[in-house]
């Protein structure tokens, strides 16, 4: 008869048989072995879960498009032998640089753990931490436990992180407050203006950094999502690169309404030519402008003319200059690897002093990222700039993942690939360095 017969199941002979079977299984499978089996099962589930996440990422994110890399080839496609790389090539004169406060410690720990895991445990480059206030002992002790690399902690001088002596502070603060009223991102945060000015014209002169030739900028609360199995400093040196980036995107237009006009005027007045400049150009517009003329939006002694500055910031003409219009593209400077010689020269210093004198770091919300980028357009060739397309990086909700180009990439399924968004600038880059996308 089909079905379950409780009398048969609970018969004495069946019960004795099951008891005997359990005894034999216990002898054959002791407690330690069962623990190992459970552990292996947990590991298998974890591996399957991670594989599932990457499968979901690939289904929701198309692979990176093939590009013409003749002028900027990858330093690595896939994984190199990281142990061999670390032994073969000499360490460059380089350091990581992070500007942070004591309150940033959790985000700093997260960033350093990610960087050590994916790169620096093999290459052991030193860290330089900077702060506008002294670091406390808790901060320093925590950081020293995260890495075997050398670590230095420095404090910024007041004249490099604050209002300079020739600035009308009340007018500057009024201009900063007005940016908050207009909803400009970080526009009403005074320390943000100080930070952008510091990274535009002073960080490379800090006493702790003067001994270095190269730097890699790191910020709190970022993540590296691919293993970096080679030394970026070494390969940049070997390939004649000066500046490297991993994210290129468009700036918020209301943060830099006059930066491009002033930079373009500086370029023309100093007869500067570079094939890098085209990266920043949009459709042409005709406008005549003299950077030396008196302008109510220039300088900081014009408190009574604040309304004129506000109107100018929203003018459709402010991003144009003699037929050249700024496309808002820039390299995100929270991840940049560069040679200090890009900054440590009279050419760059003169450019910074000229731009600083306009007051744009206060009357507008100039970021160091577009400032560095436009300076690269003035002083570097496209052959001296490198796109680390094989690396993976996440800052806030902006994400680039090397996918099949990188090494052991763990892309973040919840975030869009910056190359695939309208705010990215990969199209401008590939058109600059070659013949565009190869799948067109």
Curated annotation (Swiss-Prot):
E.C. number: 2.4.1.-
Membrane topology note: Single-pass type II membrane protein
Gene3D superfamilies: Spore Coat Polysaccharide Biosynthesis Protein SpsA, Chain A
Annotated GO biological process: cell wall mannoprotein biosynthetic process; protein N-linked glycosylation
GO MF annotation list: alpha-1,2-mannosyltransferase activity
TM stretches of this protein: 36-56
Keyword entries, A-Z: Cytoplasm, Glycosyltransferase, Golgi apparatus, Membrane, Nucleus, Signal-anchor, Transferase, Transmembrane, Transmembrane helix
Lumenal side: 57-440
Positions of the catalytic residues: 336
Disulfide-bonded cysteines: none
Cellular component terms (Gene Ontology): Golgi apparatus; Golgi membrane; nucleus
The UniProt record lists the keyword Nucleus: yes
Purpose of the protein: Probable mannosyltransferase involved in O-glycosylation of cell wall and secreted proteins. Transfers an alpha-D-mannosyl residue from GDP-mannose into lipid-linked oligosaccharide, forming an alpha-(1->2)-D-mannosyl-D-mannose linkage.
Family: Belongs to the glycosyltransferase 15 family.
Protein's name according to its UniProt entry: O-glycoside alpha-1,2-mannosyltransferase homolog 4
Species this chain originates from: Schizosaccharomyces pombe (strain 972 / ATCC 24843)
């Amino acid at each position: 008869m089909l079905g379950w017969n409780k009398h048969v199941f609970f018969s004495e002979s069946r019960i004795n048989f099951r008891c005997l079977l359990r005894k034999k299984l216990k002898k054959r499978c002791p407690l330690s072995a069962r623990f190992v089996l459970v552990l292996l099962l947990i590991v298998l589930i974890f591996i399957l879960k991670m594989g599932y996440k990457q499968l979901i990422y690939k289904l929701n994110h198309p692979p990176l498009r093939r590009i013409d890399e003749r002028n900027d080839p990858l330093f690595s496609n896939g994984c190199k032998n990281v142990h061999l790389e670390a032994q073969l090539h000499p360490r460059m004169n380089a350091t990581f640089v992070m500007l942070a406060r004591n309150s940033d410690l959790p985000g700093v720990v997260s960033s350093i753990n990610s960087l050590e895991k994916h790169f620096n445990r093999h290459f052991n480059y030193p860290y330089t931490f900077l702060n506008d206030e002294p670091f406390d002992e808790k901060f320093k002790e925590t950081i020293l436990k995260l890495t075997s690399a050398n670590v230095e902690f420095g404090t910024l001088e007041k004249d490099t992180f604050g209002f300079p002596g020739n600035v009308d502070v009340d007018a500057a603060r009024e201009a900063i407050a007005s940016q908050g009223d207009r909803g400009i991102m970080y526009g009403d945060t005074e320390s943000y203006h100080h930070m952008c000015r510091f990274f535009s014209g002073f960080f490379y002169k800090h006493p702790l950094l003067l001994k270095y030739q190269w730097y890699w900028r790191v910020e709190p609360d970022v993540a590296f999502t691919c293993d970096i199995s080679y030394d970026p400093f070494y390969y940049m040196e070997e390939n004649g690169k000066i500046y490297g980036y991993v994210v290129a995107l468009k700036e918020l237009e209301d943060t830099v309404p006059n930066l491009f006009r002033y930079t373009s005027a500086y370029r023309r007045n100093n007869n500067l030519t570079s094939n890098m400049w085209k990266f920043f150009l949009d459709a042409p517009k005709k406008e005549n402008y003299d950077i030396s003329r008196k302008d109510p939006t220039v300088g900081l002694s014009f408190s009574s003319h604040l309304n004129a500055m506000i109107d100018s910031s929203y003018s459709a003409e402010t991003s144009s200059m003699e037929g050249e219009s700024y496309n808002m593209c820039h390299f995100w400077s929270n991840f940049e690897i560069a040679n200090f010689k890009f900054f440590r020269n009279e050419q760059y210093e003169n450019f910074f002093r000229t731009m600083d004198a306009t007051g744009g770091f206060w009357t507008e919300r100039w970021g160091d990222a577009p400032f560095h980028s436009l300076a690269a357009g003035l002083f570097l060739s496209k052959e001296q700039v490198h796109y680390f397309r094989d690396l993976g990086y996440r800052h806030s909700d902006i994400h680039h993942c090397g996918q099949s180009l990188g090494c052991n990439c763990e892309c973040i399924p919840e975030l869009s690939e910056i190359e695939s968004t309208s705010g990215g600038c990969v199209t401008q880059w590939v058109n600059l360095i070659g013949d565009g996308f190869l799948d067109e």
